[in-house]
Regions:
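Polyanionic, low-complexity intrinsically disordered segments
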Residues: 59, 69-97, 103-218
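Short, contiguous, well-structured surface segments enriched in hydrophobic/aromatic residues
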Residues: 1-86, 108-109, 144, 159-166
Length: 218
């Protein structure tokens, strides 16, 4: 039920050997805000007491994105959801991109590095193969951590977002960014073969899965 799995997860968090009360402390920091206080004032939230009996739909409202991924992993393993367990590695890469963006880090640095040697999930390979991206190009681009993270984010968005309205808005944003803002001074990069090849790579993905002809997609 919607309470049991959260209780189990918070029990694990409270008694974790390496990082005890990590999720509890994160929740405790948030409940002071007026937004969260309306929902969580009915719970006895104390940073030194184990939190219990919060339904999953309210629990998901207050945890951070990284804690959501950890909870997803716990949930998938608890219920032996093999397909979902395989997504954990994809989500971990997305967390890295999210953290970089949240801290205003430059996400376009070090695009020439080959710093990710882990084999990508077969679902990602199929996703890219459907874009007519050759194996050597896939291997080359996914060997860069940042390109891999952006690729995984685009893939997972396509997999889990079901709202037509959200999809339409995000697809419009992607097209405006990729074919508008990024192209506004493309002459600056005429001699930069690395950036041109990366642009071509993402161009194929966007044209396949995020076409500006939105009604055909959603």
């Amino acid at each position: 039920d919607g309470y049991r799995i959260v209780n189990m997860y918070l029990e694990k968090d409270f008694n974790d050997e390496k990082f005890p009360k990590k999720v509890l402390k994160s929740i405790f920091k948030k409940v002071g805000s007026s937004y969260y206080d309306k929902v969580f004032s009915k719970y006895d939230i104390d940073k030194d007491k184990k939190l219990e009996y919060i339904p999953i739909w309210e629990f998901l409202e207050i945890i951070t994105f990284v804690d959501l991924v950890y909870f997803y992993e716990f949930f998938a393993k608890e219920y032996s959801m093999d397909k979902e367990i395989k997504n954990i590695f994809i989500f971990r890469e997305i967390v890295k991109l999210r953290n970089a963006v949240a801290h205003n880090s430059c996400i376009l640095c070090d695009l020439d590095k080959k710093d990710n040697t882990f084999a990508p999930d077969y679902k990602i390979l199929t996703y890219l193969n459907n874009c007519n991206i050759r194996k050597d190009t896939r291997d080359n681009k996914l060997s860069n951590s940042r390109i891999r993270q952006i690729t995984y984010t685009l893939y997972m968005f396509n997999e889990i977002v079901t709202s037509k309205g959200i999809k339409k808005n995000i697809i419009e944003d992607i097209n405006n960014l990729f074919y508008g803002r990024i192209n506004s001074h493309k002459e600056y990069y005429n001699n930069n073969e690395l950036l041109k090849s990366i642009y071509t790579y993402f161009d194929k993905i966007i044209k396949k899965y995020y076409s500006s002809d939105i009604d055909k997609i959603v």
